Amino acid sequence: MMKSEMFRISSEPEATSAEVAVVREGLYRFNFDATGLTRHYDVNLFVRDRAGKIRGGLLGYVWAEWLHITELWLSDECRRQGLGARLLQKAERVASLVGARGAFLNTFDFQAPAFYARHGYEVYATLPDYPPGRAEHHLRKVFEMRGDSWHLHGRG
């Protein structure tokens, strides 16, 4: 029997968060071992109403000196009030304080590429026809180096 025959591949759309975490943690350990970069800092920012209900937020993490913004969402009543800009600025500030030299993210053409451009993000790659008839943009923003640390342009 070949070694690969000792294993099976299964499709599990209803996988538990614990099962998903096994794969994620395995990849993190592999990346940490391969690079020697073990510092990982989660960035979880929330917009809450007076009752404490979450109305939006920004999720991401800092690893390898970069902030990866994985999600930024605001409910309809929170849009066009500057909250998205405040979330982005807060995430960048937190990231720069823990040593990030830049930030990157993905956004669809029907989401917020113009918003990110207004905040200094530049497109470095585009995946056309994803979803069909649309495009996914990959953006980044490099922070400014001052002395021996990274800072946001025009800030502290």
Residue locations for each model-derived region?
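A conserved beta-strand-loop-helix scaffold within acyl/acetyltransferase catalytic domains
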Residues: 38, 49-50, 58-67, 72
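Conserved N-terminal entry element of GNAT/NAT acetyltransferase domains
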Residues: 1-15, 145-156
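Conserved acetyl-CoA-binding loop-helix of GNAT-fold acetyltransferases
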Residues: 80-93, 118
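A conserved beta-turn-beta hairpin within the catalytic core of GNAT-like acetyltransferases
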Residues: 62-70, 79, 131-136
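Conserved active-site tyrosine of GNAT-family acetyltransferases
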Residues: 23, 116, 121
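Short hydrophobic/aromatic beta-strand element in the GNAT-like acyltransferase core
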Residues: 42-46, 57, 71, 136-138
